[in-house]
Curated annotation (Swiss-Prot):
It comes from the Bacteria. This is 2-succinyl-5-enolpyruvyl-6-hydroxy-3-cyclohexene-1-carboxylate synthase. It catalyses: isochorismate + 2-oxoglutarate + H(+) = 5-enolpyruvoyl-6-hydroxy-2-succinyl-cyclohex-3-ene-1-carboxylate + CO2. Belongs to the TPP enzyme family. MenD subfamily. The gene is menD. Binds 1 thiamine pyrophosphate per subunit. CDD domains: TPP_PYR_MenD, TPP_SHCHC_synthase. Transmembrane segments: none annotated.
């Protein structure tokens, strides 16, 4: 044992213990040499749960999914060099979707930077504006001041990551050799005796009385709508429904709002706006005077287009932090306050005669017609098309199941075909940067928190993150993956690129012709290829009772999927025109 090893051990023990005391319970470690002392010390901690993922890109998204589902800060650790760069996609997603990650990168000491040392690159501010904060940590030193410094940065990292708006932070640790700390006796047995832990308290933004009264006045007796995009706050669901009923306003609820599957059926929750807001004749009858938007922008493009063309209205965007979430540039009033506070204070101050019953009835009538057509079409078809897959998941998922939804077509199919249901289903997705990468790993991370967990994903997105399946095999995780295999990029069939047949398949369709049964075998998953509704139901039933990884593959046709969507939308449009 040398003095260097003791200094290294004490310094890192102080930092790690403070992370744990501030609320960190899990760390995802990517193996490497320079990060050895941090990895060993984390593994030694009696409370910290460790997951080791050999693929840094997968590790980043696994941590993201775990933090998203648990709403706790999760630590990521890697060695120096390009390992840290592989975290970048997950860091960007965490930043945009406000997920608390604490990214720790080991680095060469200062004397080995920019001199051609092996496995070394410039890691300072590596993630740029995609993190809330960056710190290049000091080298370990043997002094009380530096122990306090290490503890202080542990608390500070958690505080910044968890403070509204939540997000990732990056700490870079330059470390000198030798890199093996002292583990006997445990470095954590006496931790906390020399220095007190920092207690962190959080508050939320509120509005002053005059702003509240102004908002109440502007909403009373008006034709308004709530637009609720992705927002993972269960505590908002019932208060939002209650306020909507009092105002007589519809809630246009994105699948990731939580309102389509929070355990109750409410007619104020509108789930088929994507279908009927395509029609100009219908849109003209649904022009509001007030819009109040919560969460990020919903996935629906017809809804976005409708909101963009509204004019001469009050358009409130509510955000608890400092974000400016208004991509359509329609906001007239940006409200930075806690959402629950706003809902409660409006409920308390809104007069009982504030509603316009005819206005709400118009919305619910259109929605009822559209929903009944969707449900009837899905009930009557025996073809296992993409919409039918979503409808069957809606029917078959058990109470309190989790559903992680892939980007591209899956989230849009869920928007169309997952109507409101009186079951509690937790829906999650990576809708920050909206990438198709890292979705398998994110779902596996979320499966640590939610059980049973299902993943609905396209074939290209699944292929993109097959490496992530190693975590399921290694830790015997329970996840059921439903692959919608339309052999390529199905969403491009709905975009203008589809009108360029000369290059469409080579540049956008991108057929891979992969057989995923071999991927299932490689990672010890139970594999089910389903070609009928009965086979899908049987596979989901088996997977619900099986402990481990299940892969259910459904092969569909991109061109038929587009035609089916268009036929459904046309049928809804005709029915609504007849209603008028």
């Amino acid at each position: 044992m040398t003095n260097h090893e003791q200094v290294l051990t004490d310094y890192l023990a102080a930092f790690i213990e403070e992370l744990v005391q501030a609320g960190v319970k899990e760390a995802i470690i990517s193996p490497g040499s320079r990060s050895t002392p941090l990895a060993l010390m984390m593994a030694e901690h009696p409370i910290l749960k460790i997951y080791v993922d050999v693929d840094e890109r997968s590790a980043g998204f696994f941590a993201l999914g775990l933090a998203k589902a648990s709403k706790r800060p999760v630590v990521l650790l890697c060695t120096s060099g390009t390992a840290a760069a592989n975290y970048f996609p997950a860091v960007a997603e965490a930043n945009l979707s406000q997920i608390p990650l604490i990214v720790l990168t080991a680095d060469r000491p200062h004397e080995l930077r920019n001199v051609g040392a092996p496995q070394a690159m410039d890691q300072l501010h590596l993630y740029g504006s995609h993190v809330k904060d960056f710190t290049d940590m000091a080298l370990p030193e043997n002094s009380e001041e530096m122990l306090r410094y290490a503890k202080w940065h542990g608390s500070r990292a958690v505080d910044i990551a968890m403070k509204t708006p939540r997000g990732p932070v990056h700490l870079n640790f330059p470390l000198r050799e030798p890199l093996v700390p002292i583990l006997e006796p445990s470095p954590f047995t006496a931790t906390g005796k020399k220095h007190h832990h920092v207690h962190i308290y959080y508050t939320h933004e509120v509005l002053d009385d005059s702003s509240i009264q102004k908002m109440v006045t502007e909403c009373t007796g008006k034709k308004g709508v709530f637009v609720v995009g992705p927002i993972d706050k269960k505590e908002l669901e019932q208060p939002m429904v209650d306020l909507a009923k009092k105002l007589g306003w519809p809630i246009l609820a994105d699948p990731l709002s939580g309102l389509r599957s929070y355990g109750a059926l409410d007619e104020v929750v509108i789930d088929q706006y994507d279908a009927f807001l395509k029609e100009a004749e219908i849109m003209d009858k649904l022009t509001p005077e007030v819009v109040i938007r919560f969460g990020s922008m919903p996935v629906s493009k017809p809804l976005k287009n409708w909101l963009e063309q509204l004019s001469d209205i009050r358009f409130y965007v509510v955000d608890p932090g400092a974000a400016w979430k208004d991509p359509i540039k329609a906001v007239t009033d940006m409200i930075h306050c806690d959402e629950r506070f706003l809902l409660d204070i409006m409920q308390q101050n809104m007069p009982d005669d504030a509603k316009d019953a005819a206005w709400l009835s118009r919305w619910t009538s259109y929605n009822k017609v559209a929903r009944e057509i969707v449900l009837a079409e899905m009930a009557n078809t025996t073809i296992l098309e993409e919409g039918k897959i979503v409808a069957e998941l809606r029917r078959l998922l058990p109470e309190k199941a989790g559903l992680f939804i892939g980007n591209s077509m899956p989230i849009r199919d869920v928007d169309t075909y997952f109507s409101q249901i009186d079951k509690k289903i937790k829906m999650l997705a990576n809708r920050g940067a909206n990438g198709i990468d890292g979705v398998v790993s994110s779902a596996l991370g979320a499966s640590v928190v939610f059980q049973p967990m299902f993943l609905l994903i396209g074939d290209l997105s699944f292929y993109h993150d097959m490496n992530g399946l190693l975590m399921a095999k290694k830790y015997k995780m329970n996840l059921t993956i439903v692959i919608v295999n339309n052999d390529g990029g199905g969403i491009f069939s709905f975009l203008p690129q589809a009108n360029e047949p000369k290059y469409f398949e080579s540049l956008f369709g991108t057929s891979t012709e992969l057989d995923f049964r071999f991927a299932a075998a490689f990672y010890d998953a139970d594999y089910h290829e389903t070609q009928s509704v009965d086979e899908l139901e049987e596979a989901i039933d088996k997977a619900s009772y099986h402990k481990g990884l299940d892969i259910i593959e459904v092969k569909t046709n991109r061109h038929e999927n587009k035609a089916n969507h268009q036929a459904l939308w046309a049928k809804i449009a005709d029915a609504l025109k007849a209603l008028n």
